[in-house]
Amino acid sequence: MKSFRVNSIFYTLQGEGHNTGRAAVFVRFAGCNLRCPFCDTEFDSFTEMTAEEILAKVVSLHSSSVPHLPLVVLTGGEPTLQVDEAFVGQLHSAGYRVAMESNGTRPAPANLDWLTVSPKSLPLTEGKEPIGKEPDEIKIVYTGKEIETALMSYESYGSYESYGSYETYKSHETHKSHETHHPLLYLQPCDTGDPVRNAAIVQLCVDYIKQHPQWRLSLQTHKLIGIE
């Protein structure tokens, strides 16, 4: 029986991006194929769990008496190293909508309800692979470096070729039609742990978005209000 390396499962509110404020059960998978210097997540420790055990834990975390189920967010680490369509299908069968947070270097299950890709401008150890599901949002963690240069490096991954050129996909704010898919674009200030530097990065984000209105600001609201 297939097992997964799970770092943690917890019930909270989604703190970032388009789904900010939604009740969500996070399933954090261990392991990542990148080592980003600004990463604020511990994902190396794990417990081996089957899909059935994960689902049972998810169900146990929220009240069965409420009329609506929370969103399930698959995150990491890098969840595409372990998660497949069959696992997403099991969550669907239990009535959950399923979102994933990925770095975009590997194909994501095509049956996800929502895919957030947060590309990193770091050398990849793997070849180019198409994304199984196109991203619904692209979230860039902004460290203060030149964003235009970073975006050009993301295009070189080869994962976003279906959007057309860099100039084309960066100019769209939302999904314009069923025929052409354009992800929402979010710029998120990096939390460096230094309040002075953080304030400068936030201002850079605000200034950039005012000059490029197709972008939106994403804040780590869970940190702002002191929840997990």
Where would I find each of the regions flagged by the language model?
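Flexible, acidic/Gly-rich N-terminal and inter-domain linker regions that tether
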Residues: 1-26, 30, 34-38, 211, ...
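Conserved Radical SAM active-site core
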Residues: 4-8, 23-24, 30-112
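Generic detector of intrinsically disordered, low-complexity, polar/charged segments
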Residues: 12-14, 18, 28, 73-74, ...
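A broad, structure-centric signal for solvent-exposed, well-ordered loop/edge residues
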Residues: 13-16, 36, 46, 61, ...
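Glycine-centered flexibility motif
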Residues: 17, 21, 77, 132-135
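Conserved AdoMet/S-adenosylmethionine-binding subsite of the radical SAM
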Residues: 69, 80-228
